[in-house]
UniProtKB/Swiss-Prot annotation:
Signal sequence extent: 1-25
GO molecular function ontology, one term from the record: toxin activity
RLWRNWE repeat spans: 40-46, 56-62, 72-78
Key words of the record: Cleavage on pair of basic residues, Repeat, Secreted, Signal, Toxin
Keyword Secreted listed: yes
The UniProt record lists the keyword Chaperone: no
Distribution of this protein across tissues and organs: Expressed by the venom gland.
Protein origin, superkingdom: Eukaryota
Family listed: Belongs to the scoloptoxin-08 family.
Record's subcellular location: Secreted
Entry's Gene Ontology cellular component terms: extracellular region
Propeptide: 26-86, 105-122
Protein name stated in the entry: U-scoloptoxin-Sa5a
Length: 122
């Protein structure tokens, strides 16, 4: 951005000098040099502008791609959360069904704590 302003300033300066030389009646050789300089500066300025546009477009494209990736990841995460919430009651029932509960059992006069599968739903 700063470079393009500098180039614009130089271009304007060259144009002013070219006009000034034409008004003062400078010889044709100097006029041709100035004209070539102005053309070269103009061409360089246009190329720089094109490069800046391409960089800006590329950066914008990359930012959009990053946003799309983040949206996709977020959407996938939300979908997984919804699936887990839908499956939660079913999982809870399965856990209760298969849960082992401690019970006391008398064995030769000694109380032992043993784990017996829960008989809910059987």
């Amino acid at each position: 951005m700063i470079f393009s302003r500098i180039m614009r300033g130089l271009l304007c300066l060259c144009l002013v000098l070219t006009v000034f030389e034409l008004i003062n009646g400078s010889d044709e050789f100097e006029h041709q040099d100035s004209l070539h300089l102005v053309k070269r500066l103009w061409r360089n300025w246009e190329e720089d502008q094109q490069k800046d546009r391409e960089k800006r477009l590329w950066r914008n494209w990359e930012e959009e791609e990053q946003k799309d990736r983040e949206k996709r990841l977020w959407r996938n995460w939300e979908e997984e959360e919804q699936k887990e919430k839908r499956n939660l009651p079913e999982l809870k029932y399965e856990m209760e069904k298969n849960q082992e509960v401690p019970q006391l059992k008398r064995k030769r006069g000694i109380l032992e704590k043993i784990w017996i599968p829960n008989e809910i739903g059987r």
